């Protein structure tokens, strides 16, 4: 069987100039990064800003398991299938982070015959956006430490700096470090730490900014720490937002690539959904809506994280809410949610499918709370049996949700035609009536509680002492009217990663809040979620190499 990289390297790509013509983008509208990658100019973005938006399809999933759900694969395959049935379609995806690519994922550009290309470039350095975000983040760290070293005119309390350095790798050794050692010429010693780049607030800002001016304003609003009198210190107090914007002036432009079947795709921005808001850039999604009749996008991890954040944080910054939400599930994952061990997933187990359906059902119910119709996509595996498929279809029918098999990994666009037709029919026959889960005027405590009780299915929220004190502090600062971005394990509705299925009678513990005023939300840290991942015992980097002719080996 061919691997993803084997398939990708067997495809003859078309010049990106030819691909983007399908959606009305000319040679003069793009900035080329070789023959197959480009960035879209702001002139073109501004030229289409008054176009009526097309239909928006959000792809999400059940809570992920080690068995894998294939959300990006379905996103790409669905878009190719929409193109195949005659719909003018674009994709809007996130950029992969090099840390997970070298750790456990091996790549994040789809799979099989549903990939965005050139996958090697996309999975590695691409157009340099990650480097620019990393540099801007660390430039701010350097400027903070320099300000303190040079006299600390604005009175930053070096014990209360919350801004961390970043690197686009999984490196647990950098979670906590000490900087400024080596004597007075090397700065003021203080505790610091590293996050992974995709957890940086600058990544979130880049993905929520609507133009250069908005980017600069958001950067100016970043809270980097506190003074000795406990008042917040903003980037604007250091007067460096202009320099940071300069570093990011090209990174903010959306990247254009293609699928195996030639569907134009924006791949831009990449915040994680468990520790950030998990969506590609507003600029990419908005521009795709202005250029195409159908835009297919995705949100990270399960619908309890990525979709909730898409609908509560990203949608208010878009021209419209989704017309439909596709929830990806696999029979293998449903069986795991039903109590089957990973080693036994290939064996038929209808009862486990029935038990695991509770997870999918809760996600469907949650999407409906937003007033948006849902469609279930079963990402097909060779181990799926007719009996398992039949019972899943019966269970979906019982709750009135359309369901289709999708074999886009093996069959590309052909394997997604029925799904595409069902999604189009759903959009045509069921008008979405989007409503946000909470109101802006709700307190932080109320917002978190609504997410926990209405989306996660929990009983309530336990705020640890630090978080409880921050509720008062943030309300005093006027920050409590911002949206909440929950940092939680992706594997469960609860904050216990081992509580699979649809757990009930649990509380979520919030240990701390982190203000992300530039991004425009407050992060609530739960459980033991970390903003700098570590590598597994056997990282997939051990299998990566490059041939003498420069061909990449080991990505998947």
Swiss-Prot record:
CDD domains reported for this sequence: FTHFS
UniProt-listed Gene3D superfamilies: Domain 2, N(10)-formyltetrahydrofolate synthetase (3.30.1510.10), Formyltetrahydrofolate synthetase, domain 3 (3.10.410.10), P-loop containing nucleotide triphosphate hydrolases (3.40.50.300)
Top enzyme class: ligase
Keyword ATP-binding: yes
Binding site for ATP: 65-72
Reaction(s) catalysed by this chain's protein: (6S)-5,6,7,8-tetrahydrofolate + formate + ATP = (6R)-10-formyltetrahydrofolate + ADP + phosphate
Record keywords, A-Z: ATP-binding, Ligase, Nucleotide-binding, One-carbon metabolism
Family: Belongs to the formate--tetrahydrofolate ligase family.
Protein name: Formate--tetrahydrofolate ligase
UniProt gene name: fhs
């Amino acid at each position: 069987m061919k691997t993803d990289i084997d398939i990708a390297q067997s495809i003859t790509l078309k010049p990106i100039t030819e691909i983007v013509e399908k959606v009305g983008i000319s040679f003069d509208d793009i900035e080329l990064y070789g023959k197959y990658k480009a960035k879209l100019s702001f002139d073109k973005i501004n030229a289409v800003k008054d176009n009526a938006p097309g239909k928006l399809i959000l792809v999400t999933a059940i809570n992920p398991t080690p068995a894998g759900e294939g959300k990006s694969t379905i996103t790409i395959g669905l878009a190719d299938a929409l193109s195949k049935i005659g719909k003018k379609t674009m994709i809007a995806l996130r950029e992969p982070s090099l840390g997970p690519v070298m750790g456990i994922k091996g790549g994040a550009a789809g799979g099989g015959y549903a990939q965005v290309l050139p996958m090697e470039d996309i999975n590695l350095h691409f157009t340099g956006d990650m480097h620019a975000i990393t540099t801007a983040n660390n430039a701010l760290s350097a400027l903070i430490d320099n300000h303190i070293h040079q006299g600390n005119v604005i009175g930053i309390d070096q014990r209360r700096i919350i801004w961390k350095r970043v690197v686009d790798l999984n490196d647990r050794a950098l979670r906590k470090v000490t900087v400024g050692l080596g004597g007075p010429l090397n700065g003021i010693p203080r505790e610091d730490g590293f996050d992974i780049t995709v957890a940086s607030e600058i990544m979130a800002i880049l993905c929520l900014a609507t133009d250069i001016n908005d980017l600069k304003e958001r950067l100016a609003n970043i809270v980097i720490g506190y003074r000795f009198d406990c008042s917040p210190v903003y980037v604007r107090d250091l007067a460096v937002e202009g320099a940071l914007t300069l570093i990011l002036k090209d990174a903010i432009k959306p990247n254009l690539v293609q699928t195996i079947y030639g569907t134009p795709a924006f791949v831009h921005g990449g915040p994680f959904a468990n520790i950030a808001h998990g969506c590609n850039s507003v600029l990419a999604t908005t521009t795709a809506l202005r250029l195409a009749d159908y835009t297919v996008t995705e949100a990270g991890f399960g619908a309890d994280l990525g979709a909730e954040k898409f609908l509560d944080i990203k949608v208010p910054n878009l021209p419209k809410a989704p017309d439909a939400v596709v929830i990806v599930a696999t029979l293998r994952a449903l069986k795991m949610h039903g109590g089957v061990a990973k080693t036994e997933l290939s064996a038929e187990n209808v009862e486990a499918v029935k038990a695991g359906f509770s997870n999918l059902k809760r996600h469907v119910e949650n999407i409906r709370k937003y007033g948006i119709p849902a469609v279930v996509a079963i990402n097909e595996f060779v181990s799926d049996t007719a009996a398992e498929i039949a019972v899943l279809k019966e269970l979906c029918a019982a709750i009135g949700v359309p369901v289709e098999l999708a074999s886009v990994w093996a069959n590309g666009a052909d394997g997604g035609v029925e799904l595409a037709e069902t999604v189009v029919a759903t959009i045509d026959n069921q008008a979405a009536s989007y409503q946000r889960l909470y109101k802006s005027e709700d307190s932080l405590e109320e917002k978190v509680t609504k997410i926990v009780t209405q989306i996660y299915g929990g009983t309530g929220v336990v705020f640890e002492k630090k978080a409880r004190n921050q509720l008062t502090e943030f309300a005093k600062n006027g920050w409590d009217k911002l949206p909440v971005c929950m940092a939680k394990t992706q594997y469960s509705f609860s904050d216990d990663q081992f509580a699979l299925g649809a757990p009930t009678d649990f509380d979520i513990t919030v240990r701390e809040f982190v203000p992300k005023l530039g991004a425009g939300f407050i992060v609530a840290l739960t459980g033991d979620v970390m903003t700098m991942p570590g590598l597994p015992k056997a990282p997939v980097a051990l299998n990566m190499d490059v041939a003498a002719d420069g061909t990449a080996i080991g990505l998947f």
